[in-house]
Amino acid sequence: MSDSENDYSDESSGSEYESPVKKGKSAPKKPAAAGSKKKASATRKPAAKKATTTTTSTTKKSTTSKKSESDNDDFSGDDKSSSSDNENVFKNIASSAKKGKSIEEIYQKKELLDQILLRPDTYIGSTERQEEELWVWEDKRMVHRKVSFVPGIYKIFDEILVNAADNKQREGNMKFIKVVIDREKGFISVTNDGAGIPIQVHSEHKIYIPELIFGNLLTSSHYDDSEKRLTGGRNGFGAKLANIFSTKFIVECADSKSKKLYKQTFTNNMRSKEDPKITSYQNKTDYTKITFYPELDRFGMVEFDDDLVALLSKRVYDIAGCNPTLKVSLNDEELGIRSFEKYINLYFPDEENAPKVYYEKVSDRWELAVTLSKESQFNQVSFVNSICTVKGGTHVTHALSNIVTAIQEQVNKKNKGSADIKPAFIKNHLSVFVNCLIENPHFDSQTKETLTSKISSFGSRCEPSEKFIKRVLDSKSGIVASILEFAQFKDQSALKRSTSSGGKKGKVSIPKLDDANLAGGTKSEDCTLILTEGDSAKSLATAGISVVGKDHYGAFPLKGKLLNVRDQSTKVINNDEINNIVTILGLKYGKVYETLSDLRYGHLMIMTDQDHDGSHIKGLIINMVHHFWPTLLRMPGFLVEFITPIVKVFKNNQKPISFYTMPEFLKWRETNDKGWDVKYYKGLGTSTPGEGKEYFSDLERHKIDFEWDEGANDNIELAFSKSRADDRKKWMAEHIEGTFLEQFGVKKLTYSDFINKELVLFSIADCERSIPNIVDGLKTSHRKTLYSCFKRNLKKEIKVAQLIGYVSEHSAYHHGEASLYSTIVGMAQEFVGSNNINLLNPAGSYGTRIAGGKDCSSARYIHTRLNDIARAVYHADDDPILSCVVDDGKKVQPKFYIPVIPMILVNGCVGIGTGWSSTIPNYNPRDLIQNMRLAIDGKPLKPIKPWYRGFLGSIEANQGSKVQGGQYLSKGIWKKLSDNRFEITELPIGFWTQDYRELLDELETPGTRKKKKEEKEKKAASRKGTKAKPTTTKRSKRVDDDDDNEKVTEATVKSYTNYSSESTIHFIIDTIQPVDEINIEKVFKLVSTINETNMVVFDEEGRIQRFATTTALQEHFFPLRIKHYQMRKDFLSERLSEEYSRLSNKARFILAVVNKELVISNVKKVDLINKLKEMKFDRIINKNSNKSARDKIKKKKNAFDEEDAAISSDEEKDGAQEEQDDDTKGYDYLLSLPLWSLTLERVKKLIEERDSKKKEWDILLSTPIQEIYKRDLDALEKALDDQDAYDESLKNQTESLKKRTKTKALPRAKKISAKVVKDTKEAPLTKLVKPTVKIPTTTDSNVSGSKRKKSDDTTSTSTSTTTSSNTKPIESFFAKEDKKPTPAVKKSTLVSLDSDSDFDDDVVVSSKPKAPPKKTSKVIELSDESDQESDQESDQGSDPESPPKRSKAPPKKPTTIATKKATTSKSKVIDDKSSDDEVIKAPTNRPTRSRVPPPKSLSFLDSDSDDDDLYDNEESSSDSD
């Protein structure tokens, strides 16, 4: 039995239209009932306080319960609580039966009208008085206050009012709505001049149409769901409900077409009706007027009270605001509202602190306004087809989706340190007004408080303009600021809770912490915690602590750099590093410390490397303490740093000199360079434990106390606050090069000095690593890599792993292999969107556009070399004129290379440094070549636009962009194939194939990305051993809740097919809607933006500059390039002049020696030098060291290649050189000539070379630098032609291979036989038996035939005992290989070995003997403990623990090999004299033995191994032991 069956038990009889309530009551009882209802509502006041303007909580269950208490007295008996909806129905039936009620009296059927009157909640809401916070019309404005009203009477009025408004949608010429609320007479009338109701008799129902629609239930003109309507009516109740709950209901209709006026009166809750009065009507205007007298007694009312009138008046103003073209009047007073925006202003009239309201008419069907909510809770006033949806619905969610998303992005951008702000959190700070027209709307009930229609059925979309969204996001709105402020408040509260149990403790257990013995005790203030940079530094600190004692000193290693905690509250809570420090020190968030007695340590000592990164770590620790506990920094002696040398110099037995800063060392070296050995201490790990003990033994000289100063507060914020990025730019620009801190022996250091003299050096170095140079377009890591490749003359391919080591060694690279690996790979990549000119050659898998290069192979698998075009870009003749950087005491890469064209525009860049970031697109090198030629000729440069090698799409200027600077649109390529199908053959720049597949999956199945993200988080959490944070709540989703995937709420893609390769794009997509109805470029993201607004670079002087246009950048580059061409010409001229003099002097010298004018034998060195001076031979000191190196290369070229020669010459230059005095150095080129060159033939050759050099010199002097530049541009253009030809050849190769390939798919796998299926089913999966491998051995050839037969039989027996039925498929496969197997190998898994055989590394090789074995083969199963156990075991003798030696008899037939399939051990066949059938298992703890190599005639390669493993095995076969 259901509750509904019990609802009719209070009525036993009566007329069909007699009111059930009137029958059972007497007149005096009604006021008492009303009074009791008021008292009941008063008891629910606390619940009413929870109501807001957006949620009119009708408390249906409560009202239903009370209704049953008042109306069901006959049913319920004395026990009033038994009538509750939650009581057992059967108890009520039993109670009624005891009172003598019959079954017919208990189970009743009601007519619909009686049921509506008896149970009105479903149709009009509660008929009991209740109190709620609502908007009402009062004092000529909208007021939000507590209202006492009856929802039912409010609803019947709303039905009539909305019906009048619906006429506006049916009849566009409708002009007015007139509403009269007569409090004295107790009636309400609503009049509109819309299209009149036809005054004629309905042919089916035989009554007039007005009577049909106003006097009969379930009648409506809205039952055709195929018709698109923008009205509020739907179910056929509407105005009839007002008739039913009225004592009198008058319908008056004027129809100008039939010229009739219709008037009819209904009474007694629509049960009684008068005959319609039809008169003549001559006016041209139709109208409909409804007048009704609500049955006040039924609603517990005596009259229209003030609250009800205020609430009904508000609804009249709603209609006026939603229909601004209508003249709406209330009690004959026109309201004068001509727009929805003006209506919204009624909510904020003349308030000083009124929030700014942002309004936009999105379309003819959507109007939207947003403002800040003062109550920090979501408020909404919304209308659907003039219906006031007090609880919102899907229309509010949809209208706000784009706005909430934009606010979310903005807030998360400014609040990066905290958890992502959810849409529901943002909505709590908004007040929104929505007025919309929805096709055929669906509501949660007849009360129409909530819209439930799907967004796809709205018939229109609400997409606010970007201008409107920007206004909402503007700081003046206060919305973003309010959300940020509240989010930060929550974060601070969470921080305080995270350390609520912290404070001073005895012992703490944290991994890697070496706690001081007295930490956390009474003497904790005397204890010092040493924070070190890594584990190796902690080892050094531990060694030092052994000197000063462990009672007062503890050590804890940091994992790299600490988090910048400013604006990072949520990340701080989840940061293990910071939490550990807080726990170790005993700190509490939010506590203001005035003494150190509450902490576990009274001092915090920072011990980091003395390099730039070490300075940064110090600064981050200072920043953390300053942000959370600033008073600690003011306490002298709390924060301390420990300094160690960065450089030490040694000389003979003198005491080493230590330097604690690089500028300090460089200054010393200017005057003390000779005879000193230099050792660089780049990290604390360079120091030995002994040196660590020395440092701590002199602790007072190695520690520096930080001291608070007046500017400390501002300087710390300057260095670490995100809001002061512009100030940091100025801070770095004002730094004077060469400024450094005097550290050793200094007792105190102010925070301002640390920030401005030490930390600033890190910020500058960070920018140098991250931002490229305008001259060569390279960052420091790229430049070091290119320098090393040029130095090595890298024309042969080497592994990237090898190159990483070479770069680290020869260019003093200090930042780890992973960083250098990404640099090298990035310089070699050539897929679309990477490099226009790749300077390194990608030999191997360097990544593709499938994953944007992330799918590259490991450094040990890929090779590289210098690309041929590299030297066309960076000409070798420019190398000698470049100034080099000194690092680790040696010259390394130049400050910048000087390319032929501005490479900064060729390959572009993306980089983020301290205070600066840079983003430069790629451009066509041919455009740059053309512009350089124009600049040479003195002509203006042509504008260029971004260009990407291999990109097939278009790049166009964004004409509508308001961004300062250039902006371009990168567009992919798509083509319509049919009405619901199109293909994509190119993606915009920066969109990779895998990313695009994920987008298509999302468009096909919305929510896919979210599910993948959740799965990823769960996996990450499982690896960490923690629970993944839920991304969704378990509560039921409300219709006004935001969806995380609002942007993709419905499927757009039906299916798609991917034909893309590693270099091409090809998707064929089938859509649900026709292609023409979809904005393909927007929905499928086929357009991306490319900006020229952040082109930041270092100039040639090391200053950071921002360029507004590419033209300005080229104009800056060109004069610099011309200057260096002049420098190149001067250098080459000087070198040719030197060569000319050298050759001339050599010829004179040899002639003088040959003619005996100069005697060089048995002459003192001093006399010889004086003689050379007397003969006026030129002193030539070799300034151009590169020249001698090249000469050596040329001499050695025949012996080995250029790369080896370059390395060799470099080693010779770096080797020890003989010290010479100045006089000898000048004539060394003469005195070092070999004796065999002192001939006349040599003189002749030297004179020819001299004349050739003179000619070359003259040509150089006569060639203008502009001509030299043009030659280089021609050479580069030729190299680009070769690059284009290479790209074209790759395309042609793919096409030709496609045509050549005949097989499109592999042949299908063949079905297995029924016998195999049966055997497989019979063999239990848990007892897999490995195939037995037999190695037949040879014995004496004179063995008798009987013995041979016996041996064969024994072998067969042995085989059968060790071979399972599940090896039959293997046997059948191998049977094809050995057509004539010998008895010794019968039923074994032996495979013929020929030249084409491929097999695994774990094999047993055996040779078939000339004669059968003398002894029976025995099977031994060896443990697979090591793969190194091999055939050598057969040489160990006949002992069971040592297999017999392999027969040396040469094989008569091809050797066979036994493969090991899915087994964990190896099987060997040996001879055994004691037993023919015994199977022996060798012990698993047998010592590993080296593998015996196979016979030379059986050399083979494992098909599954790669070459590297092969070479490694060959080179280190002995290592297997």
UniProtKB/Swiss-Prot annotation:
Residues 1-10, 1201-1222, 1422-1438, 1503-1521 have a biased composition (Acidic residues). Residues 412-414, 1085-1094 are annotated as: Interaction with DNA. Residues 527-640 form the Toprim domain. Residues 49-62, 1354-1368, 1454-1467 have a biased composition (Low complexity). One of its GO terms (biological process) is DNA topological change. Residues 36-48, 1021-1037 have a biased composition (Basic residues). ATP binds at residues 163, 192, 220-222, 233-240, 446-448. Residues 771-1273 form the Topo IIA-type catalytic domain. One of its GO terms (molecular function) is DNA binding. Mg(2+) 1 binds at E533, D609. The keyword Transport does not apply. Its EC number is 5.6.2.2. Binds two Mg(2+) per subunit. The magnesium ions form salt bridges with both the protein and the DNA. Can also accept other divalent metal cations, such as Mn(2+) or Ca(2+). The record marks I912 as: Important for DNA bending. Keywords: ATP-binding, DNA-binding, Isomerase, Magnesium, Metal-binding, Nucleotide-binding, Nucleus, Topoisomerase. Pfam families: DNA_gyraseB, DNA_topoisoIV, HATPase_c, Toprim, TOPRIM_C. Control of topological states of DNA by transient breakage and subsequent rejoining of DNA strands. Topoisomerase II makes double-strand breaks. Homodimer. This is Probable DNA topoisomerase 2. It comes from Dictyostelium discoideum. The lineage of its organism: Eukaryota, Amoebozoa, Evosea, Eumycetozoa, Dictyostelia.
